[in-house]
């Protein structure tokens, strides 16, 4: 079978496998690629190739992640799988692999385990919107009642962490048997196709960045004589058109102005959209009224804040992080989008210190207001060196 070029006409969705160690995440990933490859929908990626995923650096943090892709009738999927538990935590906190839906793999003979809980909680915290469950290794359990119990326990656990436990699809099967089956019509492969159908049906098409309200972090400010002030940056989401109202948010009181021009590579455009590096000309704005670190946004779409809750991963010494723990009252810089702001970290009750390599839930109080929202990623830095990564889980004020 020759390589089929993936058609980009289908909606694109990002998914990933999560769950406890040895419950079968990587086996399932390999089985999906094998069975879909037989239908010309993927390239088979064997287990050991996924397991020996190369390390990537994301914001200075080393994460081992395997990427595979496949398609169904409805969609094109990019799927991530991480070899180690720590890689998952880093992945979810840095948003290196943003997931529109997660496939939670749970071994039926084990039931939910500590990492199962942690991955569900993290999915909720970092904003993974949908979970589909693959109940693996059902061939290892003789008693159907035990399988039902595990299923009940899982639904309760999902509900406890804010997912709709009663509605979450639970597909039962054996990833190993599906991986070993060479005939795509073999009954052992049925679970793979059921899983794909469940993801197709249950995880909605994500809202594309271009359809969200406009936001561009300011990287640079210029004044062009006779024309006014231009702010440049990469459009994070949405579309900006000439003569639309915008707000400048962060550091100082928010103010409104009008976009009087959009330029890209010195050419004038009618609009700039998500992913474009553009210059936006602002009406009647002085050069000293705007600065790097503020954002240009659709009015009312984002507000400045100083206090929030976050999930944070602290880099290990080997990752270039701190060599020593930090304590309550720690004051590093928090790097949001294009700038550093000093803030104070409050540690959770009963936590006296945080060691390199830990992940914690924390509260942060910034000394100046910044345009913030839930699920925004940030780096924690000391003197320009990244020592941690975080994601906002809740805005306080």
UniProtKB/Swiss-Prot annotation:
Name of the protein in question: Elongation factor Tu
Subunit description: Monomer.
A GO CC term attached to the entry: cytosol
Chain sites annotated for binding GTP: 19-26, 81-85, 136-139
PANTHER family from the UniProt entry: ELONGATION FACTOR TU, MITOCHONDRIAL (PTHR43721:SF22), ELONGATION FACTOR TU-RELATED (PTHR43721)
Pfam families xrefs: GTP_EFTU, GTP_EFTU_D2, GTP_EFTU_D3
Residue segments, region G2: 60-64
Class of enzymatic activity (EC top level): hydrolase
Sequence positions that bind Mg(2+): 26
Region described as G1: 19-26
Protein task: GTP hydrolase that promotes the GTP-dependent binding of aminoacyl-tRNA to the A-site of ribosomes during protein biosynthesis.
NCBIfam families, per the entry: EF-Tu (TIGR00485), PRK00049.1 (NF000766), PRK12735.1 (NF009372), PRK12736.1 (NF009373), small_GTP (TIGR00231)
Location(s), subcellular: Cytoplasm
Source species of the chain: Syntrophobacter fumaroxidans (strain DSM 10017 / MPOB)
KW Aminoacyl-tRNA synthetase (keyword) present: no
Location of region: G3: 81-84
InterPro entries xref list: EF-Tu_GTP-bd, EF-Tu_GTPase, EFTu-like_2, EFTU_2, G_TR_CS, P-loop_NTPase, Small_GTP-bd, T_Tr_GTP-bd_dom
tr-type G domain segment(s): 10-207
Region (G4) location: 136-139
Gene (name only): tuf1
Molecular function as annotated in GO: GTP binding; GTPase activity; translation elongation factor activity
EC number of the protein: 3.6.5.3
Lineage of origin: Bacteria, Pseudomonadati, Thermodesulfobacteriota, Syntrophobacteria, Syntrophobacterales
């Amino acid at each position: 079978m020759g390589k089929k070029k993936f058609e980009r006409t289908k909606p694109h969705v990002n998914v990933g496998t999560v769950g406890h160690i040895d419950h079968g995440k990587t086996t399932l990933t390999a089985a999906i690629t094998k069975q879909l490859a037989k239908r010309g929908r993927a390239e088979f990626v064997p287990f050991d190739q996924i397991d020996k995923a190369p390390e990537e650096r994301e914001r200075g943090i080393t994460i081992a992640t395997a990427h595979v892709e496949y398609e169904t009738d409805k969609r094109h999927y990019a799927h991530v799988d991480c070899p180690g538990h720590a890689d998952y935590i880093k992945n979810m906190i840095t948003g290196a692999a943003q997931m529109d839906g997660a496939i939670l793999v749970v071994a039926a003979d084990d039931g939910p385990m500590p990492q199962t809980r942690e991955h569900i909680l993290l999915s909720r915290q970092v904003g993974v919107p949908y979970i589909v469950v693959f109940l693996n290794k059902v061939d290892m359990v003789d008693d159907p009642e035990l399988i039902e119990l595990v299923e009940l326990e899982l639904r309760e656990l999902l509900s406890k962490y804010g997912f709709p436990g009663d509605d979450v699809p639970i597909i039962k099967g054996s990833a190993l048997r599906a991986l070993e089956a060479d005939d795509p019509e073999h009954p052992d492969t049925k679970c793979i196709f059921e899983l794909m159908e469940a993801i197709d049906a249950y995880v909605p098409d994500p809202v594309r960045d271009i359809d969200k309200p406009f936001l561009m972090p300011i990287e640079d400010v210029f004044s062009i004589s006779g024309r006014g002030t231009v702010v440049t940056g990469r459009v994070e989401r949405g579309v900006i058109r000439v003569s639309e109202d915008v707000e400048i948010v962060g550091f100082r009181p928010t103010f409104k102005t009008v976009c009087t021009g959009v330029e890209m590579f010195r050419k004038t455009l009618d609009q700039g959209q998500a992913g474009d590096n553009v210059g936006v000309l602002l009406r009647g704005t002085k050069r000293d009224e705007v600065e790097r670190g503020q954002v240009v946004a659709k009015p009312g779409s984002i507000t400045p804040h100083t206090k929030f809750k976050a999930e944070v991963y602290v880099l290990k010494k080997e990752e270039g992080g701190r060599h020593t723990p930090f304590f309550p009252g720690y004051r590093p810089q928090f790097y949001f989008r294009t700038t550093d702001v000093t803030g104070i970290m409050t540690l959770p009750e009963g936590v006296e210190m945080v060691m390199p390599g830990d992940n914690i839930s924390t509260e942060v109080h910034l000394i100046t207001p910044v345009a913030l929202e839930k699920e925004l990623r940030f780096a924690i830095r000391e003197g320009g060196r990244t020592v941690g990564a975080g994601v906002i889980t809740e805005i306080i004020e």
